[in-house]
């Protein structure tokens, strides 16, 4: 099932709602942060066993990044930790060029990655500073849609597991909005909470 998640609820809340409505075991092929919107690919019943076929698919996003400040979480929900002068268009393009292709990016502290057996975001909430590991990501597309004032809107296509918030931080800002538009061959325009895609049909598109 393809669902267009609105900003606000967690991905797990969307999964739980479908589980309540269907009474079937339900999972997902990649979460979205609560502040983010866009495409979730949900798996129900026996299809949950096929999660590995979908989790590793590339993702596409549109994001608005505020280049005047970094936040503690890389999104609008965190505290401002640094004020910055927005870069010129030429400097922005230089920063973008460094992030295209294969890159190593620090995993955000406000993430579900486990550090010493505990979720990183729980450590961050308690004010415990830890050295976050990096993750190798592949950035296929990183294009400017618009750049006005301190706000840049980007279209980006990245490998599974890439944190767009980490890209925003590397550019010298934080995500104000984030919308997932594609998961592999599936697009947000196809999202319909009332349509169940048969597993065979979904697999045939990969």
Q: What are these regions, as identified by a protein language model?
A:
Residues 1-206:
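Catalytic/RNA-binding core of pseudouridine synthases
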């Amino acid at each position: 099932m393809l669902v267009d998640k609105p900003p606000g609820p967690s991905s797990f809340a969307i999964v739980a709602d479908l589980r309540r409505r269907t009474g079937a075991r339900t999972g997902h092929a990649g979460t979205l942060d609560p502040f983010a919107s866009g495409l979730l690919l949900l798996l129900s019943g026996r299809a949950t066993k096929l999660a590995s076929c979908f989790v590793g698919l590339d993702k596409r996003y549109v994001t608005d990044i505020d280049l005047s400040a970094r936040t503690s979480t890389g999104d609008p929900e965190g505290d401002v930790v640094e004020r910055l002068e927005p870069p010129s268009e030429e400097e922005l393009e230089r920063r973008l060029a460094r992030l295209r292709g294969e890159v190593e990016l620090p995993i955000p502290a406000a993430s579900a990655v486990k550090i010493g057996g505990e979720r990183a975001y729980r450590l961050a909430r308690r004010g415990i500073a830890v050295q976050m590991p990096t993750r190798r990501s592949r950035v296929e597309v990183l294009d400017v849609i618009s750049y006005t004032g301190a706000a840049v809107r980007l279209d980006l296509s990245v490998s599974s597991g890439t944190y767009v918030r980490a890209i925003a931080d590397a550019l010298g800002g934080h995500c104000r909005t984030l919308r997932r538009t594609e998961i592999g061959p599936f697009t947000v325009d196809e999202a319909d909470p009332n349509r169940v895609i048969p597993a065979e049909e979904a697999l045939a598109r990969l």
